[in-house]
Regions:
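Short, flexible/disordered intra-domain loops and linkers
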Residues: 38-53, 150-159, 194-208
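Active-site-proximal C-terminal subdomain of hydrolase catalytic domains
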Residues: 183-355
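Boundary/activation segment at the start of structured domains
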Residues: 1-80
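A general structural detector for well-ordered alpha-helical segments in enzyme core domains, enriched
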Residues: 64-68, 169, 213, 217
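Detector for Asparagine
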Residues: 13, 49-52, 63, 157, ...
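Extracytoplasmic/periplasmic, Sec-exported soluble proteins
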Residues: 53, 57-60, 113, 165, ...
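Catalytic-core segments of thiol-dependent peptidases
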Residues: 33-38, 69-196, 313-322, 326-327, ...
Length: 355
């Protein structure tokens, strides 16, 4: 929707109408993942989930994108608030994409769009002006190298270039497409680093944050950008090792609880039949014992949630070949081990003129 405001600039000046855009987009952008061919740094820092193997690596970004949708405000029927899921389709099988679309639209009421080149992302941002909408938040989930977010990492020289969000694309981000309070978050490796320093920052060495992709993007879009100077780790996408062990143990407890619940229902049914029989006969003594007690769950609701997520991932793994999680990643992206000497976590980059 739009709000029309009138302002009087002076006694001799005509009244003017100023249109204030009040329609906002919250946008998740998901790259394609090719875990079989990782650069040496990513292979070291983004450890594969042992239980899921490389099949799990293939849906890291998708699962985090689904998780991110849940962090946004709920979309409204009049689209004044809209959640958007953009996905680069390179090397994702159609069956997987169709299921992701069903989850995004059906479970989260978000708009689902497929991209085949980086120009599609640039055009999407530019179209916010034509549609009189503004981006309130944008999140990138993809591989990354210094000075670029790689939405098609190691997909082939031509394709990789066409799916690269680099300095040139960052400078194309029209500030008018973003709300004044908008934020961009990059969960790609080293978006906040100014040049490739290898695996450690030497004493006295300048990481040149001011020359990073994050800073260039902040200046172009005139908003704050949050990015990692280090490589990023997706190893807890399916939960920490403790989470996964607990989920397996909870699954065992759930099976036991299911059997106990079935036994309880049989005992309860028998108890009710005996009560009814005694009431009908009037000569038969009613059961003198109290009704059976239902079994108590030996696990928390959170434990059950993690266990059921694991079960659903296994089902998807059998059906699609990958452990898609319609509830999203269990744990957020974190900092990797390198480059050593750089801050852990996300750094905030403000437009230069605001610093």
């Amino acid at each position: 929707m739009e709000e029309q405001k009138q302002s009087q600039t002076g006694p001799d000046n005509p009244t003017t109408e100023v249109q204030a855009v009040a329609d906002f987009d919250y946008v998740t952008v998901v790259g394609c993942s090719v875990p079989q061919i990782l650069d040496s740094w990513s292979a070291r820092d983004i450890a594969s989930n042992v239980w899921n193997g490389q099949a799990g690596d293939k849906v890291w970004f998708i699962n985090h994108g689904i998780r991110q949708l849940q962090q946004y405000p709920t979309g409204t029927p009049d689209y004044s608030i809209q959640r958007v899921f953009l996905i680069f389709t390179e090397q994702y099988p159609r069956k997987l994409l169709d299921e992701v679309k069903s989850i995004v639209e059906g479970m989260y009421g978000a708009s689902y769009r497929e991209l085949t080149s980086i120009s599609g992302l640039v055009d999407f941002v530019q179209m916010r002006l034509k549609k009189q909408r503004r981006i309130k938040q944008m999140d990138f989930y993809a591989h990354g190298v210094v000075h670029s977010v790689e939405f098609g990492y190691e997909t082939g020289n031509k394709t990789q270039t066409e799916l690269r969000f680099g300095l040139a694309q960052a400078r194309m981000m029209n500030e008018l497409a973003f709300d004044d309070e908008a934020r961009i978050f990059s969960y790609a490796c080293r978006t906040g680093l100014g040049f490739d320093i290898g695996d450690r920052l030497d004493p006295g060495e300048d990481p040149k944050y001011s020359e990073s992709l994050a800073q260039v993007l902040a200046d172009a879009a005139d908003i704050r950008v949050n990015a990692f100077p280090r490589r990023t780790s997706y190893e807890n996408t399916f939960g920490t090792s403790t989470d996964r062990k607990a989920a397996l143990e909870t699954q065992r407890k759930m099976e036991q609880n299911k059997r106990e619940q079935e036994q309880y229902l049989r005992r309860l049914d028998d108890y009710r039949h005996r009560l009814k029989a005694a009431d009908n006969a009037r000569t038969t003594s009613a059961p003198d014992e109290p009704p059976p007690e239902p079994p108590v769950k030996p696990y928390s609701d959170e434990d059950e949630k993690l266990a059921r997520q694991m079960e659903l991932r296994e089902i998807y793994k059998q059906e699609l070949g990958v452990p898609l999680d319609k509830h999203g990643a269990v744990r957020p992206v974190s900092s990797g081990k390198t480059p050593e000497g750089l801050p852990m976590g996300l750094m905030s980059f403000s437009p230069t003129e605001l610093e």
